[in-house]
Amino acid sequence: MGKRDNRVAYMNPIAMARARGPAQNSGPTIQDYLNRPRPTWEEVKEQLEKKKKGSRALAEFEEKMNENWKKELEKHREKLLGGNESSSKKKEKKKKEKKKSSRLSSSSSSSSSSDSSSSASDSEDEDKKQGKKKKKKKHRSSRKSSSSSASESESDSKDSTKKKKSKEEHEKEKDGKNHHRKRKKADRGDGPLSSESLSGPDQTEEVQVKKKKSNEEKEKATDKAKKRKKHKKHSKKKKKKAAGSNSDLE
């Protein structure tokens, strides 16, 4: 089996461009752009003057708007001036009416003073009556509150006594059950602890003390045994060293 031919034909781009020949003209060239027709300086001046003047229609519109605006300003001024005059007239009328009312009030004040004195005495009597009623209501409310607080305290004390009784009964039941269980264990013959279990919660502390003492004695015995073993090992090492030294001397 032969190898596959992976060669590619190389084409020189410059030679290909020469073979195509000169490129066709597409669109205007640079020379055409440079040789374009241009306006003279006089024509440019005329165009600038026209721009400064602006259009006639716009100028007419601005004139009309200015005229309308001036008319509206005049109307507004007239309204404001008329309103100021009318307001001044109204103020004068109000002043005159106040003067008349003050004169009438001065004449009526003398008559009203006597009426006010009688009304003041009546109002004082009413205030005293209302004060007495309020005191009575407060006294009643205080009595009710004291009676309600006493009843609440009694109910709380009853509840507390009931709770204490229920707790005591529950503890007694627990003690009875524990005593019954210990009796059963003693009947079965669990050993020397049966007599101690029958003696109740008072001897539990003694049992704990005995256990602590026994544990301490066991620890002491173990410590003594360890010390003896260490002493024996040390004495054996000394004997070996002494025997080795004697053999060397011989």
From Swiss-Prot:
Residues 103-121 have a biased composition (Low complexity). InterPro entries: Fam133 (IPR026766). Residues 90-102, 130-143, 177-186, 225-242 have a biased composition (Basic residues). PANTHER family: FAMILY WITH SEQUENCE SIMILARITY 133 MEMBER B-RELATED (PTHR31911:SF1), PROTEIN FAM133 (PTHR31911). Residues 18-250 are annotated as: Disordered. It comes from Gallus gallus. Residues 39-49, 59-80, 155-176, 214-224 have a biased composition (Basic and acidic residues). Belongs to the FAM133 family. Transmembrane segments: none annotated. This is Protein FAM133.
